[in-house]
Curated annotation (Swiss-Prot):
Classification lineage: Bacteria, Bacillati, Bacillota, Bacilli, Bacillales
Function: A possible function for this protein is to guide the assembly of the membrane sector of the ATPase enzyme complex.
Name of the gene: atpI
Presence of keyword DNA repair: no
Protein name, entry field: ATP synthase protein I
Keyword Ion transport found: yes
Amino acid sequence: MDDPKLTFSRQRKYLLFILAVYVLGYGLTAYKTVFLGLILGTVFSLFNFLLLVRRMNAFDRAVEKGKSIRSLGSAARWCNAILAVAVAYKNPEYFHMASTVIGLMTIYPVIMIDSFIQLKRSSMEER
């Protein structure tokens, strides 16, 4: 199994690559509001991912010391998502609402696809 820091670093790199593609889409196409919504949602998704990584590291340290931790910070991530949707709702001339929500969910397919790829790699190495 991979080191969690390597996994998080790889997933962060994938998310930044997707964000760069969205920025190119904003600059090169006529769908400005759609790509701006994707960018907004993905930036908040990246921030939520970084919050999750930070909380998971704190959780690991607490487990090593035999202490308990209250939560993994779901409330903070929900508040960030609500903030992103509120920004898109207040500024529909700049941000497409549906693409903002899609951008917020960008990290989840990245995590799943990365996990699937790593599972395939590890099964290929065992053969």
